[in-house]
Amino acid sequence: MNLKVLLLLLGLSFLTVFALVYVLLTRQGSFSQSPRCPSIPPRIHPWTHPSQSQLFADLTPEELTAVMSFLTKHLGPGLVDAAQARPSDNCVFSVELQLPAKAAALAHLDRGGPPPVREALAIIFFGGQPKPNVSELVVGPLPHPSYMRDVTVERHGGPLPYYRRPMQKTEFVQIWRHLKEVELPKAPTFLASVLNYNGSTLAPLHSTASGFHAGDRATWIALYHNISGLGVFLHPVGLELLLDHGALDPADWVVQQVFYLGHYYADLAQLEWEFKVGRLEVIRVPLPTPGGASSLRPRVTPDPPLPPLQFSLQGPQYNIQGNSVTSPLWTFTFGHGVFSGLRIFDIRFKGERVAYEVSVQECLTVYGADSPKTMTIRYLDSSYGLGLNSRALVRGVDCPYQATMVDIHVLVGTGSVQLLPGAVCVFEEAQGLPLRRHHNGIGGHFYGGLASSSLVVRSVSSVGNYDYIWDFMLHPTGALEARVHATGYINTAFMSGGAESLLFGNRVGERVLGAVHTHAFHFKLDLDVAGLKNWVIAEDAVFKPVAAPWNPELQLQRPQLTRQVLSREDLAAFPWGSPLPRYLYLATNQTNAWGHQRGYRIQIHSPPGVHVPLESSEERALSWGRYQLVVTQRKEAEPHSSSIYYQNDMRSPATVFADFINNETLLGEDLVAWVTASFLHIPHAEDIPNTVTVGNRVGFLLRPYNFFNEDPSIFSPGSVYFERDQDAGLCSINPVACTQQLADCVPNLPSFSYEGL
């Protein structure tokens, strides 16, 4: 071959290899060099202008600080920071927003009237008064308070005894200090040789309610092995103590009984003596290993590929200003009660209000076991603070990676404002499911559909062992959905017995019983269906025999509608076990284009509830749990179905939800629906290390029922439609075909950060 030709070929080969290497190298770095996806703002409609109203906004740090300064000045020099307070001290327990009266709020929102005065509700523990008590004070106007008024009697029908006060962090600290410094030293040999206690390897978990009579403050406390990085809840050791901590001076607290392996003792000194003389049957419990079953550390090395992630290539189709959220379809404001948790207000679809308030009211768990601590558990989690215990959410796990994270500020259990960073997230959820679709082959060939998506606001309450994921979801159909998932650690008891222990759950570890329990969640739905005057209507279907019109000798069983207007509250109260109409909705006298009353249907997603028997002395405090659904007249004097004061006094509640049902008329009134969603949990091996969200979800839907003239999602811009003779691969025909073009850009992703530990 000619040398020049050979050199030319070698040169071309070198250039080709160089070009290929360049392409490969640049493609490997193409992610960082690709253009950013263009951010397309949400579509503008008359109803999408965000409300400037701050009626329902949580108190700002400045407002919280102003209220604390005002209270400190006006309640006297004896006020102590709650974070250091003893039971005998006076302290400000909590400060949060005092919600305005609905009439005043609507006068402002709907008729342009002046906004109601912004006020705070403060809870004061007066442990230092001659007659210790709990008082509730309304403080205003904000942001510059000048007055306070005592609303305790107005809200609770009388003074609040001091023993009803919720447990605060300082009391838990004082309880553990008392046990470690006063009680545990009475049994050093037993604790060291049987439970491997070295001064730091045990932790207390407590039961509530405290005591069996009004005025009691005596709590069963179980000890668990506590190793850093492990779930303490899965490591019971079998030792439990009944501590009376009702005295104002912790020095006067006393252990009334001790429980160990099915037997009761006067105190730990007796237990120690019986152990030393060889009369005590024991089960030695080794310390758990750091990599054991209760650890949430990954069992495998992280290895690509990553799990699927959800991105919005063109940016979110919603705006958040303060606590107001607007989208092309929905507007609402959200709040975060310190005790009740997530709530949303003034919820409108295309500018028309659907509901004034949808909120969490209570979260109840009731346990069974053969140990005193576990069998006495009736946790009312609002008393611990569903909002206070809403911790920072993790991008890409707790919420989609692109979610908008919202900080929350609270003041409870301390004299200063506490930041809960990223405790609420807002995002659009693509559910991987068609919202509607049809493939037609009869009389024509076409396809039409719309991918399902929703606007979601979420928070997670980590109360003790459980984590509750609260979602309010707003759909393009005009439906509003509430759902709660339960996850976290189960509560366990030590298996000291044999088969009798299995009456209360399943064995989930070495001498560890997963204790059976019930979950019940209560919600308030203040619906305003096309106005304040609503009716409750129940519809169902029954089969009726009918002769075929074309041949009377033929018989058919034909479904036929039944319809009943529920005129009184007692007719709209449905206890568990009673049949709930399959269609129950709130309606207005206005009609749609087809002559039907415009309405919103309440559809509950919950298994049958398991409620505390009516003969229980605790039941009246939990009476909301009797009912799967109740509709009552709305009253300012009935704002909540539960109370944070019930946790420590279930046997003499001041206000009872069942008394809301007093047979008043429901015809053309402002109505509130109260919904209970619940499930039974029998823990099993697959609840270790954590209960998973799959299968542990309940909630409800508010669905338009003849509220519109057609499905409003037909106007969604993401709708897909094409016929057989059209090229569905063209972006101009099918918006989904544009996806490939969008995929050439890089979505705008925030950097990962976390401040929640």
UniProtKB/Swiss-Prot annotation:
Task: Note the superkingdom of the native organism.
Answer: Eukaryota
- Tissue expression notes: Significantly much highly expressed in retina.
Cofactor binding, per record: Binds 1 copper ion per subunit. Binds 2 calcium ions per subunit.
Record-level GO BP terms: catecholamine metabolic process
Glycosylation sites (chain numbering): 133, 198, 226, 663
- Residues binding Ca(2+) 2 are 569, 638, 660, 662, 664
What is a single molecular function from GO for this protein?
copper ion binding
Which cysteine residues pair off into disulfide bonds? 399-425, 731-738
Question: Which residues are annotated with the PTM 2',4',5'-topaquinone?
Answer: 466
Q: Which cofactor does it need?
A: Cu(2+); Ca(2+); L-topaquinone
Give residues annotated as binding Ca(2+) 1. Answer: 526-528, 670-671
GO CC terms of this entry: plasma membrane
Q: Which residues cross the membrane?
A: 5-25
- Which stretches of this protein does UniProt put in the Extracellular compartment? 26-757
Give the subcellular location: Cell membrane
What residues bind Cu(2+), as annotated?
Answer: 517, 519, 681
Enzyme class label: oxidoreductase
As recorded in UniProt, its EC number(s) are 1.4.3.21
Q: Kindly identify the residues recorded as the active site.
A: 381, 466
- PTM per UniProt? Topaquinone (TPQ) is generated by copper-dependent autoxidation of a specific tyrosyl residue.
Which reaction is recorded as catalysed by this protein?
Answer: 2-phenylethylamine + O2 + H2O = 2-phenylacetaldehyde + H2O2 + NH4(+); tryptamine + O2 + H2O = indole-3-acetaldehyde + H2O2 + NH4(+); tyramine + O2 + H2O = (4-hydroxyphenyl)acetaldehyde + H2O2 + NH4(+)
- Tell me its family: Belongs to the copper/topaquinone oxidase family.
Quaternary structure, from the entry: Homodimer; disulfide-linked. Probably forms heterodimers with AOC3.
Purpose: Catalyzes the oxidative deamination of primary amines to the corresponding aldehydes with the concomitant production of hydrogen peroxide and ammonia. Has a preference for 2-phenylethylamine, tryptamine and tyramine. Could also act on methylamine and benzylamine but much less efficiently.
User: What is the official name of this protein in its record?
Assistant: Amine oxidase [copper-containing] 2
